[in-house]
Amino acid sequence: MSGSYPFIDIAALDSVREGFARGDAQLVLAHDLSTVLWVNGPGAKLFGYNRVEDLIEGQLDLPVATRRQIAAFSSENTSAPSAVAVRLGGGLRSELTHLHVSNIKLPDGVAALLVATQMPDNSAEAAISGLGDDSTHIALVDAVGKVVAASPRFALLDISASTLEDLIVEAGDATDRIVKRRIRTGSHSVPGAIARLTDTPALHLLCIVGDAPAQFQTAAEAVPLPDNAEAVLEEILPEQGDAPAQQAQKTHAEQPRPKTFAFDHDAPPARFIWKVGPDGTFSEISPDLAAVVGPNSADIVGRRFSDVANVFGFYTDGSIAALLLERDTWSGKRLLWPVEGTRLRVPVELAALPVYSRDREFLGFRGFGIVRPAEAEADPEEIGLALAGGIPQNRKPRKEPAETARMVGEDDVLALSEEVANDDQPAAVLPKPPLDITPTPGRRDSDKVISLLNSCAQEKVAADQAKFLKEKERATRPEGGLTKTERNAFREIAERLRKQGLANTRAESETPVSETSSIEPVEPTPPVKTRSEPIQPDETALLANLPVPVIIHSGDAIHYVNQALLDITGYESLDDIRSAGGVDVLFNSESDDGETRQSMVLRHADGSEEPVDAHLNAIAWRGGRALMLSLMPVTAADLPAPAELPAANDEEKQALEAHVEELKTILDTATDGVVLIDPEGRIRSMNHSASALFGYERDEAEGKFFSMLFAIESQRAAMDYLHGLSGNGVLSVLNDGREVIGREAKGGFIPLFMTIGKLPHTRGFCAVLRDITQWKRTEEELTNARKEAERASNQKTEFLARISHEIRTPLNAIIGFSELMADEKFGPIGNDRYRDYLRDINRSGNHVLALVNDLLDISKIEAGALDMQFEAVSLNDAIGEAIALMQPQANRERVIIRSSFQSNLPDIVADSRSIKQVALNLLSNAVRFTAPGGQVIVSTSYELNGDVVMRVRDTGIGMSKSEVEQALKPFRQINALEGRKAESAKDWRNEGTGLGLPLTKAMVEANRAQFAIDSNPGQGTVVEIVFPPTRVLAD
């Protein structure tokens, strides 16, 4: 099971484990609501997937409505689950599903969303459905170690009951409810983990990673005997009348043998993974090594590397032990590993890198190795036999000429079979079998003769002939076949090989046939192919006479080159090629102009190059394995015709070069950093500004990944931005840039704004990075200033609230006593002047109280602390109540109030108390500043664009633009131009608090409406309040 987080780590989270045990469908999403971080089997089934692996780390395409519902919850900072009803599926099969969405924290602290729902099937089998494969095994275990449910191949692990009980005890003692360690399965140990899901009743989730031991037994039997093996053995072994020792040996061979490990010499190279701790002790090794060298030979977990090296005999100079102490990355270390049950050892190449914790604590090494069974060689100490439990023989079996010939023949057949396996189709002509067991009349069965049909050279001729026929058959295919030049060359090679083979056949026909004098006893271990015979001189002679250049090499080591290769390259000998650099100096994968060719490029001794076609085969070479590379020069007819280019214009070339230099200078002059990126996400180059911005030299950053320029928290965002532009999605069209955090070479951080664009010809990208440190500083200063202003406003509001409370108490007493004295309830005052003084005291007290109330209201509005209850308000009714309250005052001032309300006016969404206060303030100002005989007109209307408008027009004295601006400021009164008042009118300008219009405007804006005033001196004033369509409850 893949994924960024181990499956069991998320399954053991407190918010996940109980639902997992119940069999709920669970899904963990990233906050983009597309990336699936984790899912269980029922969750995968809920969204139409059969396997968990099909959905983890994938993209989930949720419906737009579903995403909107989940996104609305994700913005809430709460961990409590929220019920969301969504429709899953599509078309006619869409079903309403109730999901529970909650915010969770992943093991590394990253925030994510858990989406869960109950499923009708809550069985244990349903809880682990969709989990487990050939290498991953899942089981649910109860409190006593009983397996409640398991994946299909879990039983093959053969885990004992005592092991399960120990795991349950360890999981109960673990603070994080998880135990991870190697678990014994049969005769092997594999990595695994167990998590305690529930306590009452106790239920545990067990995860095992690794193949079942039965598969190793199957691999040990994977090399079957030929069909005629029994007949051959009966023909070779002695009869009943032979020596007693031979008879006893036959009886032993007839007994059934236990299944043991069998070494497969022809197996391909295998790759395995290994880990060691800080002290050099092996903590983990993958089963791939055991499949090649045997389970006993690979059973090194828990042993120190130095001890294993001493026992297995590959501890030579101590270089690997020294590298383990240096705690640095290393590779290319080669050692010889003994093979269980054989006298062989196989080469193993090791590489490793150090592992550190988040606290930079050294945890050991993690590495990989490559074991090459085809390059096995004889082990003089025969350690492999001791690993299998056998005792090495004191005497070595004597090889007869026929046995030696048989081994050589097998090598040739192996080389031919590998060449056939590398082709796409079977060969048309198959070679004859190399061995022929022919009974001879008149002889005893013990004297049967095993004769060779061909020598080593004849087998090579047959192999090359079969290969030539196969290549001839493939030449008819439309793609990948040989060219006409290659077919002619191979016909010439085949003719020469045929003639050489006939000459060798005639020479060998005169050689007497060797016979075997005795048959060696059958070893208890499986037979192993030996490759100790050197190659025949005839084979080298054949290669030397070939007109085709041939190279025989193993990796970077060249073993042989023929004269044709020396002639074409211009080197004098093989030693000259080795001293010049070996294989690397002969070939160039790219041409001078940087364009990669389909064919290889052969480099001559003088530095010139020539395109060639190459054919690679695996062959047997001097007791080992090697690669034969045959080359064929590409003729002019095979090369594509170059396009005819116009004659180069030196002036245009110079102008183009000058233009390129100008562009480079412009990029270096730009203050923004510019970075060029290749399609693989590596840095190609950067300008001077980018180099100075990050503190890297140009050559130091080239070739490294683009993500190195960013802080850890911004690396994923930057790479997602880059990958999004690589496709043809929305990002490639709507490219609005990203804010990221850059990382300097010395470890500092820089806020950046990054914009990336695609380069048309190279398929790369261009990133423009701008330092926004000053912007961020200004933004921070503005934020701090806003917080300071809000704090000052809150202090002002708190101050006014306290002052209001302190002033109200004495004011209420003054107003109340003045009214009581003016009413003369306790006796006459006796003087009218005292009565006037009492009325002045009462009026002044009410004026101060109104001023305090207005101050408190406007401060609350500015601080956003005014309690407003928005509801449906009938604007006509609210204005009508205000007119009714102002009508007595208008009558005393001899001012006519007229109203014009539109019928069927829709209600508005507003605060009813503040709307009435606004209407009262506007009517009060209009009546107070209108001379007797004037008019005040109040109207409402419903505009075509959906606005509801309220207008208050008067015929008063009016104001100029400067006076309007002054009137809209708090505590400002208009005290100029007093001569405009009528003779019988009193001084309206000296009354009021200067808060009428500012408070009215603040209340209007608090109700999400617009306030406008238009006034002209001597013509009156019009105040207009507009409620937008969003605040209108239209039918």
Swiss-Prot record:
Cellular compartment(s): Cytoplasm
Region listing for Important for polar localization, in residue ranges: 1-613
Residue ranges constituting the Histidine kinase domain according to the UniProt record: 802-1031
Keyword Metal-binding in annotation: no
InterPro entries xref list: HATPase_C_sf, His_kinase_dom, HisK_dim/P_dom, HisK_dim/P_sf, PAS, PAS-like_dom_sf, PAS_fold, PdhS_histid_kinase
Function text: Functions as a polar differentiation marker. Essential protein that, by localizing in the old pole of dividing cells, controls cell division and maturation, probably through control of DivK phosphorylation status and cellular distribution, which in turn regulates CtrA, a transcriptional regulator of the minB operon. The asymmetrical localization of this protein is probably required for cells to enter a new division cycle.
Name of protein: Cell-division control histidine kinase PdhS
Annotated source species: Brucella suis biovar 1 (strain 1330)
